[in-house]
Structure formats: structure tokens, C-alpha cells
Amino acid sequence: MTDPFTSDGAKMPPKPFTIEAGRRQVRSFVLRQGRFTSAQQRAFDELWPRFGLEYLGTPRDLAATFGRDTHKVLEIGFGNGAALRFAAQQDPSRDYIGIEVHAPGVGRLLNALEEDGSTHVRLYHHDAVEVLEHEIADGALDEVRIYFPDPWHKKRHNKRRLIQPAFAQLLVRKLRDGGRLHAATDWADYAEQMWDVLDATPGLVNRAGPRGHVERPAWRPQTHFETRGQKLGHGVWDLVYDRDPGVGSGDA
């Protein structure tokens, strides 16, 4: 089946995950058919070769990718790209990798990166779990950021939430000793699950203490999702964890 065209003629990019025959996998996202504009199509056509990383399923040499050997920050599910763009503008000394499965957001950020003249940002349009498992080496990341992941608020859908024990263990493996994990949510129930999972994960130490959270750090701007949540009366929880150098990646 071919991908659908939007009303202005732009064609959606291929599905951002691999499909294994005979295997049904629970994913933390659903691809919703949103508006994909001609400007976003142009971004994929013209800017993807500069900023995009094609998923190959094999370990990637990030130093070669960026042309320098410095710390790497990964943002999973960057949405419209506002937080990633802000961070890259404020911190040119580190390299930034963004992962997002929804094509309109990727196209929007591609255009923004061109406008900024960014040279230290690369993007995946792919499933974050597959990227981490197959393309990111253990200990390669200085920091992982996960801002307002889908809360899957219906109880029967909780298994789709991104923050699960196996995923947390995967993050520990990919973070360098002394690295940092920063997660934010505006759903109290999801914050509770994050604490349940992350506080219990060997190799992660909650910077605010058990079941603690911090004020929004300066490196995270107030996002669209946060603003929307506050209008609905939601609180916001920023959870910051340090990668304990006393726990090896094989122990996670």
C-alpha cells in the first residue's frame, strides 16, 4: 500500500520503524495522519541529506557523523522541535541528536535548523528503541532527554508507555558514567510510574532523592505540551537522574 498524500500534494515519508515478519510489537506511539505540508516536504527533500540520519540497524560512529569528538545529547520524541532547537542554540559545544516518528515535526525542525545555520544537530525519523538498540554504542551519550512522552492515560494502554523497566535499563547502557537522564511529564500517574521504574533501575540515581523532582531546569524551555497541560490544570514533574559510575553497563 502506498503512503497517503495530503491535500496539498505532499507525500508522507516511509514508516519510521522496521517490520519483522510474524512479529507483533507493542510500540509507544501510533502514527496519526496529520497535515504534512509542501514546506515540510521540501525540508525532507532538500535538508534531510544535511541533517538526517538514515536508520541502518548497525552501530554508528558518532564522532565521524559530526566531524568531531565531543559529548552527545539525545532527545527522544522532540515533537515540534522547540526544546531541541533551543538547547542546540544555547549549547554549541555539544552535539545533539533528535528522534521523532511524526514526519510533520521532523520537517518543521529541519527548516528551523537551516534557518539557524546549525552544524551540530542530526535527526532520526525512526523508532527510538530500535535506534538505541542497534545504532548507539554503549556509553556513547552524555545525556538523554524525554519531554512529555505520550501518557497513554487509559489503564489498558499503560503497557505502551515508553518508560518501562527494559527501556530504562537500555538507557543506562547508552549513558556514559556520570551522564544524565532528564524526563518530564504533566501527568501525575505517569510521574508515579516514572518514579517506580527509574528509582528502581540500577545505575540511575535520582538527583532530588527517592520519588523527588526538580524545578524546570534552564536547559529546558517551557514546551507546547507543558503550556497545554497547565491550561488543563496539570502539574509538571521534571525528573533528573545521574548515571552512577559504580554500576557497569552489563549490570543494568
Swiss-Prot record:
Where is it found, in Gene Ontology cellular component terms?
tRNA methyltransferase complex
Catalytic-site annotation from UniProt: D150
| Region feature Interaction with RNA, mapped onto this chain | 156-161
In short, the EC number is 2.1.1.33
Tell me which residues bind S-adenosyl-L-methionine: E75, E100, D127, D150
HAMAP family, alphabetized? tRNA_methyltr_TrmB
Family recorded in the similarity comment: Belongs to the class I-like SAM-binding methyltransferase superfamily. TrmB family.
In its UniProt entry, what is this protein called?
tRNA (guanine-N(7)-)-methyltransferase
